[in-house]
């Protein structure tokens, strides 16, 4: 017997279906469900009197014969490849299948088998994204990691040794000793971690030593001297050992101009940090490098998006982070040379057209580690308000724009650093690093974070309450944060050479270590939905930025969404 249900009631029961639209947080961004993999009338849902019961939606199939460990039911997936409604099956800590869950004995077209060994996470009315990847971490304090996890970040790549003066300014873990100790410290944390060695050496032997010790990449930073010579030697080593090079270029143009840096890079793949320049880089025109096909350009979140407060807060941040002295005029001039309203405004638009590909934090070194996702979608909102729908979108939804922006914090940083085989998207076979959001809190506060197939973080009420929901409700660590579960649910990224040299055993590591790969043969065209290559020019007098001859300019935003109303404490 069939039963007809109206769309509103259906959405309230099973979540939105194809054609339904959802607002993201309090932004002007609207997404529309493109496809529904579930079957009307055959949906699975857990609860008293619901479907997932023995002989109904739950089959007799054992885990050994194919039942999954966990099913996330009726979730609205937002990923670079689509915005779809589906069940998601997890097994052995990985994404097993995306599609339709249930009991194949009584239901058709089941590709995710629910058995008595299957746990259920209710995804109805929730958005599911891949865990975000932050590739610009200054490992200044370990407390960053919990803050990042609480925001939906599950992978952190960067450098540092703690609150050392060098780490406060640069994302480098210099030398084999420090790399070893940081890799060992990663055993304590419930996220995926990887560490960059210091790339500033014209002696390649020093660089080989660091990558062989376990560095998953190398970082060139102007505070250590980013000269044409160090750029060349660093890229030579990276090409030999297949690791990524990240670069913070020469703000003062002491060793050359942006053209000299481009010449030293010589067409080799490189990840440029804070490519606009406020975070550092050739003044005033480092931004033009985003038009090079071998350059993987990223932003850091202090300039995301351009608001009325952006310029004012930057000077003090710069002075602290780069060990400058406000009593020295040259230090003030150095800081002021990096802060340009014209290039920051252009950065918004370059993100919106897909010319800038990645957004990261620059944690505690001008950036805020817990705001990567928030700042990304604040930028998307600002561009929607100021520029209207993208050509690929319509007045009905912002699907393409949302997919473009989610790519900047998930799949694109994964591709850039050679870890997309493992993380970065919701795709079969990848590690089950997933984030579940209430739409009203999207990009601000996750409802639940799954790490390696186990729940690692969740909104949770009073532990002494009779049910989970009484206040105070806030994000808290869950069981995958502890003991052996932590060690089995998260991973450490190393160079391929380090794994071949048996570094995990030499350092007595218990976490599984994964090798980065395919970092040298990629280019910007490999990045998803963010691979435009405009010809960028910068007026040296006015700092105005032009893309293919068109002036890129926008006004600062007076008020941003996803902000104070979500953070009352």
Curated annotation (Swiss-Prot):
Inhibited by HgCl2 and acetohydroxyamic acid slightly by EDTA, but not by boric acid or L-methionine-DL-sulfoximine. InterPro entries: Amidohydro-rel, Metal-dep_hydrolase_composite, Metal_Hydrolase, Urease_alpha_N_dom, Urease_alpha_subunit, Urease_AS, Urease_asu, Urease_asu_c. Carboxylation allows a single lysine to coordinate two nickel ions. Substrate binds at residue 221. One of its GO terms (cellular component) is cytoplasm. Transmembrane segments: none annotated. Keywords: Cytoplasm, Hydrolase, Metal-binding, Nickel. Belongs to the metallo-dependent hydrolases superfamily. Urease alpha subunit family. This is Urease subunit alpha. It comes from Prochlorococcus marinus subsp. pastoris (strain PCC 9511).
